[in-house]
């Protein structure tokens, strides 16, 4: 009887050739940023603090560099728009708009981090965190102690960001899963402009 080892070895080699390994997560982050001048995606968000969970969902749109629209549709309506200079936060239920300089708020929003060309690399030290399931993960730790997020994890597949996990200075753990992503589709400039509706309170967050 012939030994099975050569056959098993050949099968393993063939399997490896048929399913090449993904690039590292850091390399995929760079490819994701450089390869998507615009991005639109649905998202589902879960925030956990001391055992309590809050879930929300909505839509993200990005136009690099620096413009984004992060819109919550469930369970409440909230709109966050970065027009490149000013960050606008519109709480419809409160009839209130908060306005602040976008540059000062880059570290406080996942969308702001994603909309820049290299904001994450500029503000965080990146390390490979290995593969879990079918995602390659990186771990990002802040270079400065006053950053809003104390830790960020990002999971990629085929140069596309699938999931973010963030821990902030208040002890909140946030998990964001992206779906229905479209890269480099035309997005109207009006999507990244905001004018406070009549009758709402406008406060400065600077």
Swiss-Prot record:
Signal sequence bounds: 1-23
Major site of localization recorded for this protein: periplasm
Domain of life of the organism encoding this protein: Bacteria
Assigned keywords, A-Z: Chaperone, Periplasm, Protein transport, Signal, Transport
Pfam families: LolA
InterPro entries listed in its UniProt record: LolA/LolB/LppX, OM_lipoprot_carrier_LolA-like, OM_lipoprot_carrier_LolA_Pbac
GO biological process, one term: lipoprotein localization to outer membrane
Cellular localization per UniProt: Periplasm
Assembly with partners or alone: Monomer.
Family statement drawn from the similarity comment of this UniProt entry: Belongs to the LolA family.
GO CC field: periplasmic space
Functional note: Participates in the translocation of lipoproteins from the inner membrane to the outer membrane. Only forms a complex with a lipoprotein if the residue after the N-terminal Cys is not an aspartate (The Asp acts as a targeting signal to indicate that the lipoprotein should stay in the inner membrane).
Name of the protein in its database record: Outer-membrane lipoprotein carrier protein
């Amino acid at each position: 009887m012939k030994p099975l080892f050569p056959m098993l070895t050949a099968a393993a080699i063939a399997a490896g050739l048929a399913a090449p390994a993904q690039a590292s997560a850091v390399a995929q982050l760079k490819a994701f940023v450089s390869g998507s001048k615009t991005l639109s995606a649905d998202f589902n968000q879960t925030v956990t603090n001391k055992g309590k969970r809050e879930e929300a969902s909505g839509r993200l749109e990005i136009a690099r560099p620096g413009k984004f629209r992060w819109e919550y549709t469930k369970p409440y309506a909230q709109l966050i728009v970065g027009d490149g200079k000013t960050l606008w936060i519109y709480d419809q239920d409160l009839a209130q708009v908060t306005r602040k300089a976008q540059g000062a708020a880059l570290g406080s929003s996942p969308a702001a981090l994603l909309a820049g060309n290299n904001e994450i690399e500029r503000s965080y030290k990146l390390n490979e965190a290995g593969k879990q399931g079918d995602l390659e993960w990186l771990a990002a730790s802040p270079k400065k102690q006053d950053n809003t997020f104390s830790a960020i994890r990002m999971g990629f597949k085929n140069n596309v960001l699938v999931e973010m996990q963030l821990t902030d200075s208040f002890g909140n753990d946030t998990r964001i899963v992206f779906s229905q992503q479209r890269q480099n589709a035309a997005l109207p400039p009006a999507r990244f402009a905001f004018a406070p509706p009549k009758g709402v309170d406008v406060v400065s967050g600077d």
